[in-house]
Structures are given as structure tokens and as C-alpha cells.
Amino acid sequence: MNTHPYIRAFLSGIFVPTLLLPLLLAGFVLLRLVLRAPFPIERGLIFPMALAPVLWGLWSMLWLRSHAQTGLPLGVHGAILPFLMLPGGTLIGRHVGILVLGARSVTWFEAVRIPYALIGCAFAFAVVAYYLAWKYIVGTLNRVLGIA
């Protein structure tokens, strides 16, 4: 089964975010419509929901392409992705006006202030979560699809 390995790599990469994003959407709908959150979450939700699976799929394809030269384990490769997503998301958020960077915190939707210390803790958690997801879930899918 050596036909179309990059398509199979893309499919194994999009598996995790495609399963998790509907749960995230349900949480945001609950927050916005049921709990009446006073800020427009939907402005900052649609673009990341469309972009995250594509990034994961392309990142998986990149691993397949570069693994022979780099020898980088899949979990480590996956843990690098948040280091690209955080600056990219911050740049896009500032450009569209949903993020304002302050001296000690980030203001989100002109309503919620998030201290940089909390962002740092969440980022560290994300790096570990990405490592585990890529090592165990995407790695298993790669083996099942015959590309690992």
C-alpha cells in the first residue's frame, strides 16, 4: 500500500483536531448562548476551526517528507507545532482586532484580560498535549495506514 502516502499522512494528521473541534464548538456555544458571555466568541472561533485541521494535516505530511533526513520522532515533531501556531495566531488576532497585547496581559475581545503567566502555563500544557497526541494517536494512525 505505497500509493498516495501524503494523502494518508494528511488524513492521519487531521484526525485529532477534527474530533476535538466539535467538542470545543459545543463548549463555546454553551458559553456564549447559555451562559450569555458578554463578548463575541464567534469572531475568533471560525477561522481557527477551519485552519487547525489543515495545519495538522500539512504538519503530518511534512513529517513524512522530512523524517528520512532528520530522524525526528513524531511526538517531538508534533510538539514543535505550537511554537508556530502561537505566534501565527497572535499575529492574526492582532491584525483582525480580537487581541491587544499589553504590558502584563493580553486583552481578548476587548473584554477578557489573560495574564502572560497563565498563557505561559497553558502553552506548556499545549506542548505536552501535542507531544502525546502526535506520539500516540497520530503515530498509531500512521502505523495503521502503513506510512510509519
Predicted regions and their residues:
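N-terminal signal-anchor transmembrane alpha-helix
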Residues: M1-L51
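Structural motif marking the loop-to-transmembrane transition
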Residues: T3, I7, L11, P38, ...
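Lipid-exposed faces of alpha-helical membrane segments in multi-pass integral membrane proteins
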Residues: L19-L23, G27, L55, L84-G88, ...
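Alpha-helical transmembrane segments of polytopic integral membrane proteins
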Residues: L23-F28, L55-W59, Y130, W134-V138
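Alpha-helical transmembrane segments and their membrane-interface junctions
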Residues: L24-R32, P87-A117
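Membrane-interfacial segments
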Residues: L31-P38, L62, S66, T70, ...
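Loop-to-transmembrane helix junctions at the membrane interface
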Residues: G57-R94
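Alpha-helical membrane-associated segments of multi-pass integral membrane proteins
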Residues: G102-A148
